[in-house]
From Swiss-Prot:
GO cellular component, one term: cytoplasm
Protein name: Glycine--tRNA ligase
Localization (cell): Cytoplasm
Catalytic activity field: tRNA(Gly) + glycine + ATP = glycyl-tRNA(Gly) + AMP + diphosphate
Annotated keywords: Aminoacyl-tRNA synthetase, ATP-binding, Cytoplasm, Ligase, Nucleotide-binding, Protein biosynthesis
């Protein structure tokens, strides 16, 4: 496999060509760091969300789901601290006039040199033009995207597109606790779109202004928060490993106390070795101990009692919150980068050729099986279509009869399809088909009547 820095360009090209991800608004010149998900991309993205929801909600008795609004009352963001504190340091190169986040520039320098720049931005070269010491003094820039609600665009109608899904959970905490009759410890999960006016979006779908989050707010008794925090760090790390991410490409990063968010007692990031230009590691998921900051703040600001009464101990308290927060888009990028493999396989003439394989866990693969008649034939194609239609009732299945069978295998390898089922002329005589496994390319001959059961045994959890 190529180095990940090289693989990124290859992956972007493959993503567009194979219908995973397209540049948004492309026919009008595009919009920076905006991407649309194509037919295969939306399947992969939905599979990522499905596996997360299954692990975090459906397989647990202590977490329930929620779907809150994208636009919340402005007071929510004032109370949470976002209006005042959701800001980033903006600096501009006076040579090329490109703008950057000052903290990202210094962090990249520190990652490369092992120490912060002695003279701050004055020691740094512009990533775009190379000019040294040409940066302006940083000024704070709000990451909130504004909109207006109602017929008049004035201060009275000012609202914000949510920068995170978490606040929608906090303001519904009491509703969920009472209606679902949950007892501490319990959690509320949500998947949804968020928006941030990023200064320097980029690295494909890693950092965008519109993105999707998968978050849980897990409410615990004060004093048990540190134990629960470690539990969620371990649990979330294992989720990625169980779905096929090479553990050597994962690490935990402890936020220094001086860099913690205003609400955090402790934050640990799960990082992946993306090998971006200037930065080997990038945040995949953050797990934060938010203490009682959010519920206390909203309780005080709204006048609503958000405390919890424990009947067993006859005590009342504001719960602490542990928050595992992941981005759907960068999680998808991680699975794609880690699965992308190049090896060699013989072509129809026996000559070895490069083969691109997306070694995705079958639970994530956009297409679970492809049904391929050996050739486009009046006898083979209808039989193959019938089998594909039958399998499609259980999984996402492709039918393809265009081109040489070897090229069709390669197309399916490239998008990560775990199994290809080939209908050939012998099938007309013995009612058997050939099933080819993606990674090993091993082939097995089975009865056409056994294909569904054969796949079901190998696609468990899909």
């Amino acid at each position: 496999m190529a180095a990940k820095s090289e693989a990124m360009d290859t992956l972007v090209s493959l993503a567009k060509r194979r219908g995973l991800v397209y540049p948004s608004s492309e026919i009008y010149g595009g919009l920076r760091a905006s991407w649309d998900y194509g037919p295969l991309g939306v399947e992969l993205k939905n599979n990522v969300k499905r596996q997360w929801w299954r692990a975090m909600v459906q397989e647990r008795e202590d977490i329930v789901g929620l779907d809150s609004c994208v636009i919340l009352a402005r007071e929510v963001w004032e109370a949470s601290g976002h209006v005042d504190a959701f800001v980033d340091p903006l600096t501009e190169c006076q040579s090329c006039h490109k703008r950057f986040r000052a903290d990202h520039l210094t962090e990249a320098y520190e990652a490369k040199h092992g120490k912060p720049p002695a003279n701050g931005l004055a020691d740094l070269n512009c990533p775009h033009c190379g000019a040294k010491g040409a940066f302006t003094e940083p000024r704070m820039f709000s990451g909130l995207l504004r909109t207006y609600v109602g017929p008049v665009q004035d201060e009275s109608g000012l609202a914000f597109l949510r920068p995170e899904t978490a606040q929608g959970i906090f303001i519904n905490y009491k509703n969920v606790e009472q209606s679902s009759r949950r007892k501490i410890p319990f959690g509320i999960a949500q998947i949804g779109k968020s928006f941030r006016n990023e200064i320097t979006p980029g690295n494909f779908i890693f950092r965008t202004r519109e993105f999707e989050q998968m978050e849980v707010e897990f409410f615990v008794r004060p004093g048990t928060d540190e134990e629960w925090h470690q539990y969620w760090i371990d649990t979330r790390l294992q989720w990625y490993i169980d779905l096929g991410i090479n553990k050597d490409n994962l690490r935990l990063y402890e936020h220094p106390k001086e860099k913690l968010s205003h609400y955090s007692k402790r934050t640990v990031d799960i990082e992946y070795r993306f090998n971006f230009a200037g930065s080997e590691w990038g945040e995949l998921e953050g797990i934060a101990n938010r203490t009682d900051y959010d519920l206390s703040t909203h309780s005080k600001r709204s006048g609503t009692d958000l405390s919890y009464f424990d009947q067993e101990t006859n005590t009342r308290f504001i719960p602490y919150v542990i928050e595992p927060s992941a981005g759907v888009d960068r999680t998808m990028l991680t699975f794609l980068l880690d699965a992308y493999t190049e090896d060699e396989a013989p072509n129809a003439k026996g000559k070895m050729e490069k083969r691109v394989v997306m070694r995705l866990d079958p639970r994530l693969a956009p297409v679970k099986a492809a049904v391929l008649p050996l050739s486009r034939n009046a006898d083979l194609s209808p039989k193959a279509r019938d089998l594909a239609a039958k399998l499609r009732k259980r999984w996402n299945v492709e039918f393809d009869d265009a081109g040489a069978i070897g090229r069709r295998y390669r197309r399916q390898d490239e998008i990560g399809t775990p199994f290809c089922v080939t209908i050939d002329f012998d099938t007309l005589e013995d009612n058997a088909v050939t099933v080819r496994e993606r990674d090993s390319m091993a082939q097995e001959r089975i009865s056409i009547d056994q294909v569904e059961q054969y796949l079901a045994e190998r696609l468990a959890g899909c």
